[in-house]
């Protein structure tokens, strides 16, 4: 039951991107074919925009930008491709190559089940196109920490432990 939705270029930059409604209607993978030109500082803004949209919608967001072969004397395209999963990102700029990453769809769906925003009984209105995709066994391209909830950085670990202790103390205080 994978639902994929597409936006085009500036859709994600708009005040109310179409991906919001698509996510509310069940899309867990959002794709954007873009031709966003390069200006000073735009790359970090673009990364934060895609990362934020992915996190806010608890979705995988695949952003494919025009590359240098499509640049002209008036505009430069850097091929800034981004794959974001619920806020995490993988991006390469001016690399003129394809990027590949995994998106944990089951994790995203699990997170959505815990979020009341996605628990709606409203009727869906967006048009749907059925498709078939073959699933192949592949090696993972990213690694996962054996202890994902324990920060490796000692300062972050101490902060996390303090936070856990305070949450538990406040819970016990209420009893």
Q: What kind of region is each of these model predictions?
A:
Residues 72-75, 79-175:
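Active-site-adjacent "lid"/gating segments
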């Amino acid at each position: 039951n994978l639902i994929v939705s597409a936006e085009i270029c500036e859709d994600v930059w708009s005040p109310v991107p179409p991906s919001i409604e698509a996510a509310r209607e069940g899309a867990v993978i959002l794709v954007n074919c873009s031709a966003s030109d390069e200006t000073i500082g735009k790359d970090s803004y673009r990364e934060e925009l895609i990362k934020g949209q992915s996190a806010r919608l608890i979705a995988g967001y695949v952003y494919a930008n025009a590359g240098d072969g499509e640049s002209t004397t008036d505009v430069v395209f850097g091929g800034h491709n981004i794959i974001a999963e619920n806020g995490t990102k993988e991006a390469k700029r001016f690399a003129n190559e394809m990027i590949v990453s995994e998106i944990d769809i089951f994790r995203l769906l699990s997170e959505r089940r815990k979020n009341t925003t996605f628990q709606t009984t409203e009727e869906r209105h967006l048009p749907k196109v059925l498709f078939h995709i073959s699933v192949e066994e592949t090696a993972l391209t990213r690694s996962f920490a054996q202890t994902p909830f324990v920060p490796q950085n000692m300062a972050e670990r101490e902060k996390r432990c303090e936070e856990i202790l305070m949450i538990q103390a406040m819970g016990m205080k209420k009893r």
